[in-house]
Amino acid sequence: MSKMESTQQMASSIINTSFEAAVVAATSTLELMGIQYDYNEVYTRVKSKFDYVMDDSGVKNNLLGKAATYDQALNGKFGSAARNRNWMADTRTTARLDEDVNKLRMMLSSKGIDQKMRVLNACFNVKRVPGKSSSIIKCTRLMRDKIERGEVEVDDSFVEEKMEVDTIDWKSRYEQLEKRFESLKQRVNEKYTSWVQKAKKVNENMYSLQNVISQQQSQIADLQNYCNKLEVDLQNKISSLVSSVEWYLKSMELPDEIKTDIEQQLNSIDVINPINAIDDFESLIRNIILDYDRIFLMFKGLMRQCNYEYTYE
């Protein structure tokens, strides 16, 4: 960039510096508020908004255009400067500026910023005093001009009204507030007491329920132990019964085939599960009764063939 474009360079630098200041202000505000943020995200969002506002409002092009006009004037080209001067002095330009000002005033009114607020903001500035809660109110040049033109008046009615406000009976106001506070305190205490009683009742019911559950669990454990003992006793009794029958079977004068068949049926009895063992005993007894019935029928038939009669005594 040549030396005679220094004004454009300075304007561009001011715009870039304004953007950096906006980023620093945003991040500093977030840090003071204790809000965690991503610097890259804040930078991107501020840049997007800043570029949009500067471009949409025409401020950037206006500044760079004026800077280019100054550079052309420094280079000895006064044509653009003369056109800008004539444009600024033209009645149509003045009318457009008045129209823009009126639009801005109506826009401020629509946002709730009325004439009183606009005038007060234009007449006064507030200067903060470092290290103090108070501040200094400074009058602007507009306020000084209004005083010189006699456009500033003192409203005596406001002073009298202010004096009446200062004579408020603060003692009675304090007593009223104290009564309201005591009433509110009493209601809060009543609610708190009610909540405490409900909480105690809930705790008592919970402890009572826990005791009932504990007793039931103890009874269930006792019943379980009793059932386990009964099951063990039945298993031992069944095992002893099977052994006793096997020993008794061996002392009989039955054929070996019959003994083997009965022993197999005895060995098939489920000694571990008493329910299955009872079913096995039932099957064994049915088989024995069936064999006895068949033997009796054979004996009965043999007696008839031999012309013998039989009787039960």
Swiss-Prot record:
InterPro entries documented for this protein: NSP3_N_rotavirus, NSP3_sf, Rotavirus_NSP3
Source organism superkingdom: Viruses
Stretches the record annotates as Interaction with host EIF4G1: 208-313
Coiled coil region boundaries: 166-237
SUBUNIT field: Homodimer. Interacts (via the coiled-coil region) with host ZC3H7B (via LD motif). Interacts with host EIF4G1.
Protein family per UniProt: Belongs to the rotavirus NSP3 family.
Protein name: Non-structural protein 3
Lineage of producing organism: Viruses, Riboviria, Orthornavirae, Duplornaviricota, Resentoviricetes
